[in-house]
Amino acid sequence: MLQNQDTMEILSNSTSKFPTFLLTGIPGLESAHVWISIPFCCFYAIALSGNSVILFVIITQQSLHEPMYYFLFRLSATDLGLTVSSLSTTLGILWFEAREISLYSCIVQMFFLHGFTFMESGVLVATAFDRYVAICDPLRYTTILTNSRIIQMGLLMITRAIVLILPLLLLLKPLYFCRMNALSHSYCYHPDVIQLACSDIRANSICGLIDLILTTGIDTPCIVLSYILIIHSVLRIASPEEWHKVFSTCVSHVGAVAFFYIHMLSLSLVYRYGRSAPRVVHSVMANVYLLLPPVLNPIIDSVKTKQIRKAMLSLLLTK
């Protein structure tokens, strides 16, 4: 009896149901965090301003109230959400060494981070469908992609994200966490958080894998299929001008898909199979995964999308 009591005391002293986690900046470069914050601030400023400008341009310019730009609007909105979700914790660490975060704050951050990630995956699929219809069936474009159907697609993206993220977070509630509670990077990432649990995390890992399959595992083949059909259709076009037009139409979306899925899959694989990798690898990949798409997407969209570029110029000239 006494031995069992001692065991329970040791367990209670080494675990916690409501822990405080310690976020990590760039491991090994803590003394240079203030200097490292300069490029981070630049990236955040580009992501926030670039996506905000695209949202403003699409809202204010009547000529951009078309399906293609509605999807671009949603992409910028999700990129903005991803940026804001990690902004406070990342800069808090780099500027003030504010590393502590409670479990509940961590859950809230994961809700928005993973939720916006799932939504962005859905937006990329919807945009691929938009490009497929525009190129392969242009005569029926306006009848297929009506405003009501676009709204339904948007609601479906949000619903899917919420349905996928809630079980993932609810399964964290029964877990006990070890006192060694340092996370690998500057925000709460679900695979990183569950690795600190002293409880059985098989259900959490399975749920995370199911979410990955239901997003990346389904969305990526759908996007690939849409572009296979687009390429098959374009191969029958003899005019170089038409080839160039199709390429210009699709290049920004292909770039967004590449930035998003390559880094998401790389980060997932590192957490599942690269546990021996240095901590700095986890940290750098995690920050690149969140920052690169929101920074590059508005730049590519404004450069490669002629109508967006014209709308921006008209706004600047009128002022």
From Swiss-Prot:
<dbReference type="Pfam" id="PF13853">
    <property type="entry name" value="7tm_4"/>
</dbReference>
<keyword id="KW-1133">Transmembrane helix</keyword>
<protein>
    <recommendedName>
        <fullName>Olfactory receptor 51F1</fullName>
    </recommendedName>
</protein>
<dbReference type="GO" id="GO:0005886">
    <property type="term" value="C:plasma membrane"/>
</dbReference>
<keyword id="KW-0807">Transducer</keyword>
<feature type="topological domain" description="Extracellular">
    <location>
        <begin position="171"/>
        <end position="211"/>
    </location>
</feature>
<keyword id="KW-1015">Disulfide bond</keyword>
<keyword id="KW-0297">G-protein coupled receptor</keyword>
<feature type="transmembrane region" description="Helical; Name=3">
    <location>
        <begin position="107"/>
        <end position="127"/>
    </location>
</feature>
<feature type="transmembrane region" description="Helical; Name=6">
    <location>
        <begin position="250"/>
        <end position="270"/>
    </location>
</feature>
<feature type="disulfide bond">
    <location>
        <begin position="106"/>
        <end position="188"/>
    </location>
</feature>
<dbReference type="InterPro" id="IPR000276">
    <property type="entry name" value="GPCR_Rhodpsn"/>
</dbReference>
<feature type="transmembrane region" description="Helical; Name=4">
    <location>
        <begin position="150"/>
        <end position="170"/>
    </location>
</feature>
<dbReference type="InterPro" id="IPR050402">
    <property type="entry name" value="OR51/52/56-like"/>
</dbReference>
<feature type="topological domain" description="Cytoplasmic">
    <location>
        <begin position="233"/>
        <end position="249"/>
    </location>
</feature>
<comment type="similarity">
    <text>Belongs to the G-protein coupled receptor 1 family.</text>
</comment>
<dbReference type="GO" id="GO:0004930">
    <property type="term" value="F:G protein-coupled receptor activity"/>
</dbReference>
<feature type="topological domain" description="Extracellular">
    <location>
        <begin position="271"/>
        <end position="279"/>
    </location>
</feature>
<keyword id="KW-0716">Sensory transduction</keyword>
<feature type="topological domain" description="Cytoplasmic">
    <location>
        <begin position="128"/>
        <end position="149"/>
    </location>
</feature>
<keyword id="KW-0812">Transmembrane</keyword>
<comment type="function">
    <text>Odorant receptor.</text>
</comment>
<feature type="topological domain" description="Extracellular">
    <location>
        <begin position="1"/>
        <end position="37"/>
    </location>
</feature>
<keyword id="KW-0675">Receptor</keyword>
<dbReference type="InterPro" id="IPR017452">
    <property type="entry name" value="GPCR_Rhodpsn_7TM"/>
</dbReference>
<feature type="transmembrane region" description="Helical; Name=1">
    <location>
        <begin position="38"/>
        <end position="58"/>
    </location>
</feature>
<keyword id="KW-0472">Membrane</keyword>
<dbReference type="InterPro" id="IPR000725">
    <property type="entry name" value="Olfact_rcpt"/>
</dbReference>
<feature type="transmembrane region" description="Helical; Name=5">
    <location>
        <begin position="212"/>
        <end position="232"/>
    </location>
</feature>
<keyword id="KW-1003">Cell membrane</keyword>
<keyword id="KW-0552">Olfaction</keyword>
<feature type="transmembrane region" description="Helical; Name=7">
    <location>
        <begin position="280"/>
        <end position="300"/>
    </location>
</feature>
<feature type="topological domain" description="Extracellular">
    <location>
        <begin position="97"/>
        <end position="106"/>
    </location>
</feature>
<feature type="transmembrane region" description="Helical; Name=2">
    <location>
        <begin position="76"/>
        <end position="96"/>
    </location>
</feature>
<feature type="topological domain" description="Cytoplasmic">
    <location>
        <begin position="301"/>
        <end position="319"/>
    </location>
</feature>
<dbReference type="GO" id="GO:0004984">
    <property type="term" value="F:olfactory receptor activity"/>
</dbReference>
<feature type="topological domain" description="Cytoplasmic">
    <location>
        <begin position="59"/>
        <end position="75"/>
    </location>
</feature>
